[in-house]
A protein has these predicted regions:
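Glycine-rich N-terminal segment of FAD-binding domains in flavoprotein oxidoreductases
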Residues: 1-12
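Ligand-binding beta-strand-loop-alpha-helix segment within the catalytic cores
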Residues: 14-84
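Glycine-rich phosphate-binding loop
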Residues: 78-103
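Class I SAM-dependent methyltransferase SAM-binding "motif I" and its flanking Rossmann-like core
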Residues: 94-141
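Gly/Ser/Thr-rich loops at beta-strand to alpha-helix junctions
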Residues: 1-3, 89-92, 160-161
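ATP/nucleoside-binding phosphotransfer catalytic cores, i.e., glycine-rich phosphate-binding loops
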Residues: 141-144, 148-174
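A short alpha->loop->secondary-structure connector
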Residues: 12-16, 102-104, 173
Length: 174
C-alpha cells in the first residue's frame, strides 16, 4: 500500500484540497501515538504529504459503540467516493475477517474481534513483536460501507497473499 500512496502523492495537480480522508480500520486499546495505529501509518504515508481538506481518524480510546456511531455519522456527512484497499493473507478487507465479513451488515462501522490469522499477519509484517501484543479488538468499516464507494482500487503486494487473492477472485462466496 505504501507504494500506491507514495505514487499518488507525486502526481501533479491532484486536487487534494477537495479530498476528505477517512481510513477503514484501526485497533482498539492502543494509545493514540502508537506507531501501529493505521491512522499514524497513514499520517506518515499520505496525510502529512498532501494538503487534504479534512482528515477523519478513527479514535481508539473511548466506548467502542460510541466510536463506531460517531465515525458512521461522519461517513454520512461525507460519503466515500474512492477507496484504496488491500487484501489480507486470510482474505480480509479492512478488518472484515472471513468469520465476520457480512455483505448484508446493517451497520457501516462496527467493532470486530480479529481473527488469529489476521493478528499473525501483523507480526509477520513486523508491526508487532508477538501475537500477544496485537490487539484483539478493532473498529472497521463494514463490507456494505466499503462497497458503497463509487470506486474501489485494490492493490495486493507480496507473494504471501497470492492464495488470498486467488480465493477472492476464483473461489466460492461463503
Amino acid at each position: 500500500q505504501s507504494e500506491v500512496l507514495n505514487a499518488l502523492t507525486t502526481i501533479p495537480n491532484l486536487p487534494w484540497d477537495q479530498v476528505v480522508a477517512f481510513h477503514m480500520d484501526d485497533y482498539l486499546d492502543l494509545p493514540p501515538e502508537a506507531p501501529q495505529r493505521f491512522a499514524n501509518w497513514l499520517e506518515g504515508h499520505l496525510f502529512s504529504k498532501v494538503p487534504l481538506a479534512e482528515v477523519h481518524r478513527i479514535p481508539t480510546l473511548g466506548l467502542p459503540e460510541e466510536i463506531c456511531q460517531n465515525y458512521a455519522e461522519k461517513l454520512v456527512e461525507a460519503p466515500i467516493d474512492i477507496i484504496c484497499l488491500g487484501i489480507g493473507v486470510n482474505g480480509h478487507i479492512a478488518f472484515n475477517d472471513p468469520p465476520v465479513a457480512d455483505f448484508e451488515d446493517p451497520l457501516s462501522v462496527k467493532v470486530v474481534e480479529l481473527d488469529e490469522i489476521c493478528r499473525q499477519q501483523q507480526v509477520d509484517d513486523a508491526c508487532f513483536e508477538s501475537i500477544n501484543s496485537v490487539p484483539v479488538m478493532a473498529v472497521t468499516l463494514t463490507i456494505p460501507q466499503l462497497l458503497a464507494a463509487d470506486a474501489l482500487f485494490c492493490t495486493v503486494p507480496g507473494i504471501q497473499k497470492r492464495a488470498a487473492v486467488k480465493a477472492t477472485i476464483a473461489g466460492p462466496i461463503s
